[in-house]
Amino acid sequence: MVFMLYDGFQPLDLAGPWQAFSSANEEAGRPLYQLSTIAATPVVSTWEQGLRMQVDGTFEQDGDAPIDMLLVPGGPGADRASAHAETMAWLRRRDAGAPRTCSVCTGAFVLAAAGLLDGRAVTTHWRSADRLRQMHPALRVQDDRIFIESGKYWTSAGVTAGIDLALALIERDVGAALSQQVARRLVVFMRRDGDQRQYSQTLRLQDRVAAPFRDLVEKIEAKLSARWSVDDMADACHMSRRTFQRKFAAHFGVAPTEVLRRLRQERASALQATGKMSKKRVQQHVGPTHNRSAS
């Protein structure tokens, strides 16, 4: 497996997947993945973090040994890498013989610039999705996915989503049991499927407003299964019911009961995705996912 680096790559886009694949080797007790790095120059820099890294080889030194998997991280240098002729030529040549090519975050811009993703469903960091659409209109950009598989190409969202991508690849290659072992080893709270949201409902809500409504969202998240009524929520915000409902609707654009339903539904979907809880247990954990419980 080869990680193609460039000046200005995001170190977490490299470190997260690298550690996951390394841990898979350790958990399996055999070298499932042989990991290496390559770039146009012997040393690359991360720019923002000031880190410098010596790679295992350069494009000029590279021969024709088979590559089973290519992975391109994202980073602020992705645009410059996309315009670098030697980088594009090497990527196209090696992709032609690789059974699988992947990107993390804005690494999708690099693959797209090489013409590898035309007509495919792809994802990237949600902040960069609109720009990817504008620069590469032939792509079908889905900005609310953790990762997407389209043929031999796998693209993922930003930073920690690279770990989710790696865990999915390990499961595909070796099986769910080893992937779960790696997740536990990395102390990953919960493995996320590719179709889960990049940006959680809680963060969406918290980004919109300040206290007391942000604090209310946190309180509800901490006790989702509680019998939250509108009066309970109003009391938590130290408001009368009427004032609370008016201000809440002005901030969020929906009723308090709808926000409660969305938070419960998101948590329920995440728990069900693990396959470890029955539907009944999930409901006990999060409470009812309809609006009739709060009034």
Language model features with spans:
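N-terminal beta1-alpha1 cap of cysteine-dependent amidohydrolase-like domains
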Residues: 1-61
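Flexible gly/pro-rich beta->alpha loop and the following alpha-helix that scaffold active-site loops
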Residues: 36-101
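A conserved active-site-flanking secondary-structure segment within enzyme catalytic domains
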Residues: 117-146, 181-182, 186
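Conserved anion/nucleotide-ligand pocket segment
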Residues: 145-185
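Accessory alpha-helical/coil subdomains and C-terminal extensions
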Residues: 174-218, 226
